[in-house]
Amino acid sequence: MQAPPHIAAMTTEEVPPRDTDIMQIAVETEQRLHHAIDSFELPGARLYGVNLGDSLEPHPAPCFLSQHPDVYELLEAPGSGLARMFDAAAIVTTGWAAPLDENGNVEGAPSRHAQRRRVRLIVLVANSGVASVLRFADEPDDVVTDPGSATGSLAEAINRFWFDPPVGQTVTA
């Protein structure tokens, strides 16, 4: 018996895996957002859901979901869980950066450092890992990438957000 023309025939052939190089996806997502966000001074952190498309080669399509003045509160907000319905999430923050000293620390607040620079950071997180891309306002054509080796409170919060989401919340009246 032949399937009706409006029903696709099913096969048992294995579909080749999609190329999900997290760093490549982060760079492409950052490029798209760089053209959409013309600022290195946002009023708050932004959260985007990122669809990668249906082809074997991903084409990131970011979708704005939410914004909050505090990136940690943004990641913990119940509505931010919507990002996990996408293939990936992108967190965008702006601020000040300053050079590290010989111990790997910044002397004082980056915003008060003599060599401070405006920066925009985009962190992409997906099941295949975490990667980040940043640009400086004084060199907007250059990007700095990190394939997931970042540490600190933001890296921990992003990992918790994607890989260890809250199971449920108790609502009391």
What spans do the regions from the language model cover?
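Actinobacteria-biased recognition of intrinsically disordered, low-complexity terminal regions
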Residues: M1-H34, D38, F161-A173
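Short amphipathic alpha-helical segments
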Residues: D21, I25, Q67-D70, A150
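N-terminal interaction modules that seed assembly of large macromolecular complexes
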Residues: T29-E73
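Short, surface-exposed beta-edge/turn micro-motifs
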Residues: P43-Y48, F86-A88, R117-L121
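Hydrophobic side chains in beta-strands
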Residues: V50-N51, T93, V125-A126
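Short acidic, S/G/P-rich loop/turn micro-motifs used as interaction or catalytic elements
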Residues: S55, A97-P99, D142
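Short HxH-centered metal-ligating active-site micro-motif
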Residues: V71-G108
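Glycine-rich, aromatic-bearing surface loops/beta-hairpins
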Residues: E107-A173
